[in-house]
Amino acid sequence: MTVTTVMSAAAFMGPVASAQTLPQIPEEELNAYPVYSGKDLELTVDAEGTHFALWSPGAEAVRLHLYADGHNGDAYETVEMAKDAATGVWRASKSEKLYGKFYTFQVKIGGEWLKETPGVWAKAVGVNGQRAAIVDFSLTNPEGWGSDTYVVTPHQTDAIVYEMHHRDFSAHRNSGIVNKGKFVAMLEPCTESDNGELTGIAHLKELGVTHVHILPSYDYNTVDETQLVDRQYNWGYDPLNYNVPEGSYSTNPADPYCRIREMKEMVQALHKAGIGVVMDVVYNHTALGDDSNFSLTAPGYYYRHRPDGSYSDASGCGNETASDRGQMSDYIVNSVKYWAKEYHIDGFRFDLMAIHDVETMNRVSAEVRAINPYAVIYGEGWTAGDSPLPVERRALKENVSKMQGVAVFSDDIRDAVKGHYSREDDRGFVSGKAGQEETVKIGVVASTSHPQVDYSKGSNSKFAYATSPEMIMNYVSCHDDLCLTDKLRKSMPEANDSVRMRVARLAQTIVFTSQGTPFMFTGEEIFRDKKGVHNSYCSPDSINAIDWNLKKQNREQFDYYRNLIAMRKAHPAFRMTSAADIARNIVFDKVKEDCVVSYSIKNHANGDEWQEVKVVFNGNDREVTVNVAKGNWTIVAADGKIDKDGLGKSKGGKTVVASRSALILAR
């Protein structure tokens, strides 16, 4: 979510019953709870039987309810659990392996029994996630899972990230995909649109991206998994069970094994295609407050509060979690490690990451990279409101230099290039708005210090907050706010789509030639729109689904994106890994024209075969002339076309740059 695209708690109307009143526990008492770091929460099965362990230090009693069904019927047995006062963990065991059964916990606190909960560590659930399931995970692995491996990008700047939603990508009637909106849509290898263009996973391979960033795939609250015939839609930023795949993306949500196996099959299929999987994680808030699994196990502990006892709300969604408390910090770290190990997830995108503390994010980075050294980790370096967490401890973009191996989205390049994210008619550099040149330069150098960049003239940040380009994710649009097509239609009403597509190419050329890691939103390579809807989090498929027939209609646009990606992958000059290299190798030209940025990348930067690259961006609606050093140049991009192997030759000197386009020369 961006700071303007937030959903009220009232929007989260899932299948959970109405809230109950929880006891108010003093902050000092919550802070004194023991932190338990054992690996046996909340379910283990071994040769001796099935063991249950719930961390609930403030509970007066805890019951374990056992069920034969994941959704219907009463408990066939209730067990009183025993407390270990030193750890705050309540335990119970059964002498048999209870595979195929379901369970919930129920906590008594303040003299009252709270509602039942599957706990916070459920790894398998019944339909709608109200009861945890006991499964044999060895039976969830697809054939060949043991040899499945992470996708290797030696540096984060080598990644090219493509953001997508399961339904958006496959739901349209012309996708050619049978399992629309499902994990297993990615298992269909050679799907085609009505007019014969590749779709699905074949499209991703043709485009050339290295990673897909998939919107929330854990079990979320707003889709009723018993009513999927209704074609419900949600982005999923309303977490219910953090460690279980979302059932609506499986072919049988009532089968606890199905969603687990099918998500693994999706990851495996993408890995076989050479594409890594980045999981969008939303540990900053929960869909429910008093009725969340956190609240029903340890009321008050997992959240931050205002002095009056109400939830603080830096998420804009009704609550915010307290990563600065030991058990919550451990939870976040162990949860992402679980996804990395069990599901072979290649990376993580943290929603509203600045709600979390720097220390927790550093733990995430270190411990995930101990599993996969090539993990891609990034997040939104902002909040949607104020937080009790001190500013200096927040994982803000301004604090990114305090974090190791964690990147933040650059709202600097986003707003400078296309126009302000929330002012829909505001223009940016690519649509002819003067005064954005210095902020574009900030984007080019990945917000690192550079002797020719004046941060005081930046539109957003006023200092070089990144100490490495690997700390920056460059983008112009994502699932939030208007997609790029709709933004250009709103801000350039006088233009036609042919002109807007040209402007979109320039925008993405700035992103893909800038230092840092490029990130793009699904479908923009074929100029998809969302019919002007700026917050489509619960809009139907008619708004969100990719119309794959656009690929043939806008084939020139797709080919430009594909060739742009190929150029970046072939040339490490665009993927430097240190601020010192950027400062040494990038030289900006003095330009008098508005909406023009011109620079050179010199010295075989980052081991590139090109000794020098000349890059010029022209956001004007007219051509401009720039001076290029005389010599033998290959024209790589010009007048809305691009080819890493060359479009032609140039001798330099006075050179024309066509309107709303990029010029790239190499020698």
Predicted regions and their residues:
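Conserved alpha/beta catalytic core and glycan-binding cleft of carbohydrate-active enzymes
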Residues: A132-V135, S365-A366, I371-F527, Y537, ...
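C-terminal beta-strand-rich structural cap/linker in extracellular carbohydrate-active enzymes
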Residues: S56, G100-Y103, L647-R667
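Carbohydrate-binding surface patches
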Residues: T44-A53, P57-E60, V587-V628
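Substrate-binding/active-site clefts of carbohydrate-active enzymes
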Residues: R167-Y343, M361-N372, V376
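Conserved, mostly hydrophobic/aromatic
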Residues: L54, F105, M164, I214, ...
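Catalytic cores of secreted or luminal carbohydrate-active enzymes
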Residues: K552-S578
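The feature marks proteins involved in alpha-glucan
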Residues: T21-G49, D84-E188
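Sec-dependent signal peptide cleavage junction
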Residues: V6-T21
